[in-house]
């Protein structure tokens, strides 16, 4: 693991870097370049998904990096149309082949799709992949507390991670509470709120000026000090480097309080209770 990024110890003892590189909305050929840049900058965790269409480019960059496989933490996700026990196992094989890997470090159910009611069977297939040593940890993404409670009641393995939309405008207090109770790591997607106004908020700009940092670095540091795992995405080399330079300063109590006061429970992405796109 990179010495620059400290690890989070997941509930099964596996170490996951607290900051990783996301490739959502990055075309395959561009993903290869971006992941190569990220690995050179010191990132050792890469977050992709079947639906992103860039598992191949991600895998090529990992192979070309020359880094030992065990030094890179790879996450991918099962897409909604593949939910169900047997179809999950087939979809995993496809993802693994595209990535060119023998195993993935973390496999996530991308969305719960409660209206289709397949996430429990899907997760049971995840448990088989874990038992067979094909994944090192299993988890979920975009699961609301009610979905987590059902999963905990009907399956055997507590999810290692729940990756959810989380940023200063959507702080997810209830989700983080159940995660803490159950030993589930909280991972933030869109940790910078997709930049939509968040990085111009006066409170964040003022804290950035105080620390001589960028607003993005301030928001990432806020996440890290809360204990969240973060996966900022960028295809701009300077931003990729900027986003990992957040381990040599700290926010004080007043800074953290000022950012925590910005919560509006405002989602930028879909509502997991109703989202059912396959």
Report each predicted region and the residues it spans:
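N-terminal binding-site loop/beta-alpha segment at the start of enzyme catalytic domains
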Residues: 1-72, 278
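Alpha-helical scaffolding within the catalytic cores
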Residues: 2-8, 56-63, 91-94, 145-148, ...
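CE4/NodB-like, metal-dependent polysaccharide N-deacetylase domain
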Residues: 11, 88-109, 128-132, 154, ...
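Acidic-and-aromatic substrate-binding clefts and catalytic sites of carbohydrate-active enzymes
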Residues: 26-29, 49-57, 81-86, 114-117, ...
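Residues at the N-termini of beta-strands
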Residues: 45, 103-106, 137, 161
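A short, structured active-site edge motif that brings together acidic residues
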Residues: 69-82, 106-112, 166
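Beta/alpha (TIM)-barrel catalytic core signal, keyed to glycine-rich beta->alpha loops juxtaposed to Asp/Glu
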Residues: 112-278
